[in-house]
From Swiss-Prot:
PROSITE patterns: HSP90. This is Chaperone protein HtpG. The lineage of its organism: Bacteria, Pseudomonadati, Pseudomonadota, Gammaproteobacteria, Enterobacterales. Its main location: cytoplasm. GO terms for cellular component: cytoplasm.
Amino acid sequence: MKGQETRGFQSEVKQLLHLMIHSLYSNKEIFLRELISNASDAADKLRFRALSNPDLYEGDGELRVRVSFDKDKRTLTISDNGVGMTRDEVIDHLGTIAKSGTKSFLESLGSDQAKDSQLIGQFGVGFYSAFIVADKVTVRTRAAGEKPENGVFWESAGEGEYTVADITKEDRGTEITLHLREGEDEFLDDWRVRSIISKYSDHIALPVEIEKREEKDGETVISWEKINKAQALWTRNKSEITDEEYKEFYKHIAHDFNEPLTWSHNRVEGKQEYTSLLYIPSQAPWDMWNRDHKHGLKLYVQRVFIMDDAEQFMPNYLRFVRGLIDSSDLPLNVSREILQDSTVTRNLRNALTKRVLQMLEKLAKDDAEKYQTFWQQFGLVLKEGPAEDFANQEAIAKLLRFASTHTDSSAQTVSLEDYVSRMKEGQEKIYYITADSYAAAKSSPHLELLRKKGIEVLLLSDRIDEWMMNYLTEFDGKPFQSVSKVDESLEKLADEVDESAKEAEKALTPFIDRVKALLGERVKDVRLTHRLTDTPAIVSTDADEMSTQMAKLFAAAGQKVPEVKYIFELNPDHVLVKRAADTEDEAKFSEWVELLLDQALLAERGTLEDPNLFIRRMNQLLVS
């Protein structure tokens, strides 16, 4: 062989191989699914390239996958006549993993085999799964359009290195030979191999053929028998497709070992003709938060594969959706640039978005437990929706789930429809609070009066919540109201006090004036409040002021944060406020007021500019 060289695997490949062989062994038959799936992708790529260059077929347009085995040599071979690979492509695809974030992903794997198995399955092991059952793998390949002498040989024992060389290969495509480990004889059994192929490959449009050997007149005659249906699953009638076939097809296109939560298969005719098959995964992909990674549907035009990750058909907040769209209205030579500005694309995107939202709404109604699984995995992504998609804001809002004072649990299970159904008579607004954590939201002094009156408050503690609530302003005609902002409806609740209490408050006017004089421009205003029951003081913001949580988001993003000026509200019935009001010594009065303000700021922000000063004041007042 010419040009032979031995190269070392990229370190991530070595790590993946080691983890995969140990954690996927209990489900080892999936190697055949992965290799046939890769062969199917190679055929799709050839069909696409041949649209503009039919010569790539080299007179052989009948694409297929073939599986054969040799019991004497203990080898299993999977071959295709798809697009094939050049030497550089072999090194890129079989010696490295060109996925961003791979290193950190692999570092997240530990000793929990069941968990590792799921994660590696999500990652998409593809070709490397061959090493689960083989102690040596040999690849012979030639790219479509290349001369026979430009074939490539690749071989490895799956340890630290591999060999690559130039060979002559007459036929186009890729041939992978697995030299099976001891104890893997089941994959040399004709019936066993047939059953695996039937299980995993019935939905693939490409014929999968198995070698048949028969003795005739003293000679061995070789023929090939097709053992899958070889019809693209989405082109079949829904009534003919079993749930098991839908699930296997999902695993094929999503490279995910886990079953999907739900799916929707639709054929639309009329002004626009298309077929869509959309899946909701049961687990978030490992790279969902990687901004560089492309997310999207597989695009087919008139059943011809065009591209993976066509992100133009799904809004970003639904980037977890997997599946495909097969359109009859787009040209076969469509490019990403054409898709970007196409009216057809926009119409399809709108229709598919509505389809997914309807699918999720149905899941929420039919199976609350499954929907909760979805929410735990993808809720944070869906919360991007109200800001991104005003047209579907109401539909998205119905799908949101929150923690609330009604359940007093950190689990986000309360829908807005649930909340509205429990609103008190005369209640016109949906009350919520945002905080750094569920515990901080639940124990916020802003809730005291509302809890006392039995009014439910939504407890929001995800980082995205404050940003989301800037766009989600109402639901079912009822406006949202942050309980940490000054509002007339909250004041009405607080003003339900008797006349004697109001007279007592007038006597505290000089006290309020003293506090204002002491704090000056540090606060926007000082006032008495009846919103509190157990807490001496709180700080709140005006309706037009930036909230505390939004200021924190600005700071975390490295942006300049406008100064937040708080309204300092004091509880006239609290013993500490009465103590401060009765203090004539100005120095001690100052200590009391500063301590009350620091307490209120700490409850609101979770931090103080000078915590040491706060501790000193606290200690001084404790010993005085």
